[in-house]
């Protein structure tokens, strides 16, 4: 079957922003203007197509990333048809995993900013995630019709926090006087017709704003010229570049992520300017414009795959979702080749082959069956049972392993138990399914209490997951109070720590002996787990016993010596050992390593780590002093205070997570409901002695 749309006319984009900046509203308008939807769905009515989960419709927020496809020929229908695959992502920090895995597979992103709120905390988080995966992006300023909207203040915040913005449009008016934009490429004013819900528009000469528009156009042309020395010389000589040159070189700078933003603005809810957002065709890359994807072959040699149907098949599974009608959907991004329904693929991580049942094309939670997927496609596959998020699928005859995705560690935990015996088995199935879909969610059984412990990225994250168990699996559950995900580590280096397992009780003995050294690993923002090195010289311990040593330490990492919390940031070097020809075994060396690691932790001045959160509070100025005082009383360190576009203050602080439970109620009371806050995990830090002792006592039941 021939490709319907050339890959050069594909755009795989995500729409991301801070919560309530207008991502989903923007996506709904795009679907309307491209003819996918014949009616605009509103978030506040619970009718948005992309917010299809019941919890999303009730709460008016996006919880899970939703994918859809539309086709676009330009505002004036002058372009060949382009295919745009869109992923609408959540804005709440508790669901940051959805943004993370979407960024991994996208070719470009549209960042939506509120013209009133400016660059808000989650906007910066998403920007860093896009930087991590080198995703080219455009910025769009939304809500220009709102009281307090300030286009220039927002761009100033972008410049201070994100990079140098380069406008490609200029606003005509603001707040209730916002009428349209001036296209700085064509130097034409675009005025949208509200009666047709923005479907119709007209070009006008921007006479009244000509001087301001020319100033911004000069800045845009200069930004394009900076991409190339020859181009800059020509610009300096003539003072002008052609429209095609400007577009081409701006696109190149966006593609190279040179901290340049080509952005439009609009008011999505009032249907003004959303069509201009489809400037993604002009400025964001197709799959063939980005570098080939990197990986390793079955000999662990570096290899690449170009975005071409002629290459061997390769894809990345970036999301799992359970559908009540067809079972597990595995969302894949195809980087190269063609795959048809019924074909067999190879998973190099698991070392297993699997057969594809069929493919579907998603529109939020609606499905249309398709026969095949090609390079550049994003689509769910049905029938895969062994795969997990972040793993590679490839041609069994041409193996490649793509770079895996790294997921954040949970920072909050709760005990959960079924209300009735009938719910017991169903709860186990539900938790297993949810954990399979969401890599930032963990579930374990506490060995001492027998309780089931669920862990996630925040209170809302766990609340939504428990609600899902009830709605989707019919499981009624009681939930305990939130608990902080503490960690343990060591402060100093210890050498020559003995670990010995020696039992003789008649018959074959049980002997293993290791000598290890332990070091503290440097930590940046996230705990790094541990490194293990074998530094044994000579034949004092056979090589077959090294993996059991590693396994023994791995198991002991789950339970530290202070309070039983997981141990992180530790490097272990094995530099001596002894064995017995008859009595030694893998199990004995595993036990010896566990004993040695435990003893090493005790000697290495162990300490408890607690998660620190980056907190931003938006408050009227009258309450700013009280807010800062309250944050300080919670062991918080106030790190700065900025003015909000509409007045008031944004207070930035770093606060231990353990001090933030119930903060929303306190803040609401303190500010008469006028202040809001957001919070995200920042890093782990050593807990003060009194906090560590209190935490240890609680775990030990004192």
Swiss-Prot record:
UniProt cross-references to Pfam families, sorted A to Z: EFG_C, EFG_III, EFG_IV, GTP_EFTU, GTP_EFTU_D2
Subcellular location: Cytoplasm
Described function: Catalyzes the GTP-dependent ribosomal translocation step during translation elongation. During this step, the ribosome changes from the pre-translocational (PRE) to the post-translocational (POST) state as the newly formed A-site-bound peptidyl-tRNA and P-site-bound deacylated tRNA move to the P and E sites, respectively. Catalyzes the coordinated movement of the two tRNA molecules, the mRNA and conformational changes in the ribosome.
SMART domains: EFG_C, EFG_IV
GO cellular component terms, A-Z: cytoplasm
One GO molecular-function entry: guanosine tetraphosphate binding
GTP-binding keyword on record: yes
SUPFAM superfamilies reported for this sequence: EF-G C-terminal domain-like, P-loop containing nucleoside triphosphate hydrolases, Ribosomal protein S5 domain 2-like, Translation proteins
Family to which this protein belongs: Belongs to the TRAFAC class translation factor GTPase superfamily. Classic translation factor GTPase family. EF-G/EF-2 subfamily.
Record-listed GTP binding positions: 17-24, 88-92, 142-145
Protein name: Elongation factor G
PANTHER family to which the protein is assigned, alphabetical: RIBOSOME-RELEASING FACTOR 2, MITOCHONDRIAL, TRANSLATION ELONGATION FACTOR G-RELATED
Residue span, tr-type G domain: 8-196
Alphabetical UniProt keywords: Cytoplasm, Elongation factor, GTP-binding, Nucleotide-binding, Protein biosynthesis
GO terms of biological process kind: ribosome disassembly
Organism encoding this protein: Thiomonas delicata
């Amino acid at each position: 079957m021939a490709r319907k749309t050339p890959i050069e006319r594909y755009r795989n984009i995500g729409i991301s922003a801070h919560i309530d900046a207008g991502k989903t509203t923007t996506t709904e308008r795009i679907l309307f203007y491209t003819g996918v939807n014949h009616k605009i769905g509103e978030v506040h009515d619970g009718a948005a197509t992309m917010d299809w989960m019941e919890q999303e419709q009730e709460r008016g927020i996006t919880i899970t990333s939703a994918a859809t496809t539309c086709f676009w020929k330009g505002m004036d229908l002058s372009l060949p048809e382009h295919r745009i695959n869109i992923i609408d992502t959540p804005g709440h920090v508790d669901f940051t995993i959805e943004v993370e895995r979407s960024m991994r597979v996208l070719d470009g992103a549209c960042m939506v900013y509120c013209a009133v709120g400016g660059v808000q905390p989650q906007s910066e988080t998403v920007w860093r995630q896009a930087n991590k995966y080198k995703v080219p992006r455009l910025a769009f300023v939304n809500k220009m019709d709102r009281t307090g909207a300030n286009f220039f203040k927002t761009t100033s915040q972008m410049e201070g926090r994100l990079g140098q913005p380069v406008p490609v449009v200029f606003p005509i008016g603001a707040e209730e006087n916002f009428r349209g934009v001036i296209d700085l490429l064509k130097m034409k004013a675009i005025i949208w017709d509200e009666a047709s819900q923005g479907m119709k528009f007209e070009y006008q000469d921007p006479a009244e704003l000509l001087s301001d528009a020319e100033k911004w156009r000069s800045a845009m042309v200069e930004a394009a010229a900076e991409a190339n020395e020859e181009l800059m010389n020509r610009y300096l000589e003539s003072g002008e570049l052609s429209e095609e040159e400007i577009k081409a070189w701006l696109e190149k700078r966006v593609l190279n992520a040179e901290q340049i933003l080509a952005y439009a603005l609009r008011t999505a809810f009032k249907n003004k300017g959303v069509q201009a957002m489809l400037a993604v065709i002009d400025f964001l890359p197709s799959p063939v414009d980005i570098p080939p994807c990197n990986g390793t072959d079955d000999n662990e040699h570096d290899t690449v795959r170009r975005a071409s149907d002629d290459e061997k098949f390769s894809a990345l599974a970036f999301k799992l979702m359970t559908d009540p009608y067809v079972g597990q959907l595995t969302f894949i991004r195809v980087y190269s080749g063609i795959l048809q329904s019924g074909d067999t693929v190879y998973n190099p991580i698991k070392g297993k082959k699997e057969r594809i049942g069929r493919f579907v094309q998603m529109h939020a939670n609606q499905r249309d069956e398709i026969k095949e997927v090609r390079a550049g496609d994003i689509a769910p596959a049905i029938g895969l049972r062994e795969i997990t998020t972040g793993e590679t699928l490839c041609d069994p005859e041409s193996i490649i392993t793509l770079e895996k995705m790294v997921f954040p560690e949970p920072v909050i935990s709760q005990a959960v138990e079924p209300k009735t015996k009938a719910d017991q088995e169903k709860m186990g199935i539900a938790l297993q399914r949810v954990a399979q879909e969401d890599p930032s969610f963990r579930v374990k059984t506490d060995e001492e209490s027998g309780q089931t412990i669920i862990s996630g990225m925040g209170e809302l994250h766990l609340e939504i997951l428990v609600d899902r168990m009830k709605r989707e699996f019919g499981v009624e559950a009681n939930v305990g109070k939130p608990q902080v995900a503490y960690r343990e580590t060591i402060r100093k280096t210890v050498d020559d720590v003995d670990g010995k397992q020696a039992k003789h009780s008649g018959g074959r003995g049980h002997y293993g002996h290791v000598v290890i050294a332990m070091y503290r690993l440097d930590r940046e923002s996230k705990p790094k787990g541990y490194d293990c090195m074998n530094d044994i010289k000579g034949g004092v311990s056979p090589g077959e016993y090294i993996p059991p040593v590693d396994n023994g330490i791995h198991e002991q990492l789950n339970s530290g010596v202070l309070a039983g919390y997981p141990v992180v940031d530790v490097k272990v070097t094995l530099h001596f050992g002894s064995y017995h020809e008859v009595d030694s075994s893998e199990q004995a060396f595993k036990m010896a390593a566990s004993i040695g690691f435990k003893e090493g932790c005790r000697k290495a001045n162990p300490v408890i780590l607690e998660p620190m959160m980056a907190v931003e509070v938006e408050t009227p100025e009258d309450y700013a002093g009280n807010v800062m005082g309250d944050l300080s009383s919670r062991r918080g360190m106030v790190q700065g205070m900025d003015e909000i576009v509409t007045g008031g203050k944004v207070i930035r602080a770093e606060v231990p997570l353990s001090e933030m439970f119930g903060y929303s109620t306190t803040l609401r009371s303190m500010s008469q409901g006028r202040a809001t806050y957001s919070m995200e995990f920042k890093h782990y830090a050593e807990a003060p002695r009194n906090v560590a002792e209190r935490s240890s006592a609680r775990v030990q039941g004192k």
